[in-house]
Structure formats: structure tokens, C-alpha cells
Amino acid sequence: IAVRGLLTVTALAPPYFVLLGGGQSALQGLGALLLASAAAAFAGSYVWGRLSDKSSRKVLFLSGMLAAGFATLAVLAEVSGWAGTAWVIPVILFFFMLSYQGVRSARSVYLVDMSPEDARSSYAALANTAIGVLLLITGAFGGLLALAGPVASLIGFAALSLAGGLLALPLDEVENG
């Protein structure tokens, strides 16, 4: 639950990408950002699903690291002035959302594979309730950081993604083959 909780930031970060490099014109590039997000969902579901079936623990690690890296890359694009270029943030968002798809796939597979068959619904209910609370907490954290701007939020989200990915490393392998 701790790994999933830390990686919830991958679901909360995309609106902050919209705010980068745009100022008043941030919404003008929204179509490209939506296209990047949809393409990542399409491309990622098959690949991450197959990899999660082999090792959801490794997918949680890898997708946490990728999310941290691409959030950091977005921050670097903003501070270097590249975020205002029409294609930069959509490309970074595509890869960030690809990592989010990895988190989504692996967290579900890990939960199903680790829980005894007769207790899966109880495990899922408990995990989903805990994640709901953690989403509120990480959302509030992101909101507080947003007072300093989207860069601060993305830095915080990158740190939490990094922590979530690293915390996935010592998890047990639970796949059945």
C-alpha cells in the first residue's frame, strides 16, 4: 500500500504539465497533451500488462523511476525555457503517462497475485480505501506545493515517485509464473 500510495502522484501530476511553459496560452496546447495522454494509454496497456504478469514488482520500480525522471525532465524544460516549444511538454507528458500506465497495471496485478483467492475482495477493499485516503493527502501536498507554482509541485511529485519506485524493490515477487 505504501508503494501504491507514493505512486498515486502519477495520477495527480498531469494538470501541472498543462501549466508549464504556457502562462495564459497554457490551454492552447491542451489538444496535444490530451493526444499524448491517450496515445500513452493505448501504447502502454499491452506492454505493461505483459511485463506486470512477469514481475509487477519490477514494473512498479521501473515506472516509478520513469515517472520521477520525466517529471524532472519537465521541470528542466521549464527552467531552461524549452517548455514553451509546442512539442516539448506533450512529448514529455507522453512518456510520463506511459509510466503512469505501468503503475496502474502493476499495482493491480500485484494486489491480485499477492492476495489469497478467498480474500481478494477484502484485500482490494482495504487497499482501495487506503489509497483513497492517500490520494487526498498527496493531492493536498501537491496543492500546497502549487502555491509556489507547477515546478514545485512536479519536483515534489518526482521525489514521491522516486521513493515509491525504490520502495518497490524489496517487495516480494508474487507472480505465479
How should these model regions be labeled?
Residues 1-33:
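Helix-loop boundary and gating motifs at the non-cytosolic
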Residues 53-67:
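Cytoplasmic membrane-interface "Motif A"-like loop-to-helix N-cap segments
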Residues 156-177:
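Multi-pass alpha-helical transporter architecture, strongest
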Residues 102-115:
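Intracellular juxtamembrane helix-capping segments at the cytosolic ends
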Residues 85-102:
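Hydrophobic core of transmembrane alpha-helices in multi-pass small-molecule transporters
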Residues 43-57, 146:
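Helix-to-loop junctions at the C-terminal end of transmembrane segments
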